[in-house]
Amino acid sequence: MNTMGLDLSLTSTGVSIGGSTHSIRVDTRGVERLKEIRDSIINTAVEHHIEVVAIEGYSYASRMSQSHSLGELGGVVRLALFEHSIPFVVIPPTSRAKFATGKGNAGKPEVMSSVSAKTGIIWSGGDGGDRCDAWVLEQMLLVKLGRSHYDWSKEQLDALNKVEWTGLPNV
């Protein structure tokens, strides 16, 4: 089963497919930006025959000035996946952090450090945190599907219990 992890962002959307990561960066604004990011995600999903996607959920505690625009992006991407019959699961940011580090309040630097220590992968560049988050989301999905190649602690696996997994194939 081909899987994808998505850390949605208006400036640098992190994408993980089979453990390989990249980011989507566009120079446009407004609705045109939403369309470009959506199209890039869907084209990549179709090209790689993606069968299920893990998306990071909204951060309700965030005070970002662009939270409404990020919400629009989340809705646009979810609708596009639905229209292409690609099932997805939404993973809360605190569950992603807890899975990566054992602590639900861990920030991006802690997540990157913890994942690097476990895997040897170095998350460099300005988009490293976004790519790392997408990788973690995909790993959570792979664990749930019984396909992860890594050993995870009980504390990390407990993060899976806070995710609504219904609707996924073979779960």
What function would you assign to each model-found segment?
Residues 1-171:
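Phosphate- and other anionic-substrate recognition elements at nucleic-acid/protein interfaces
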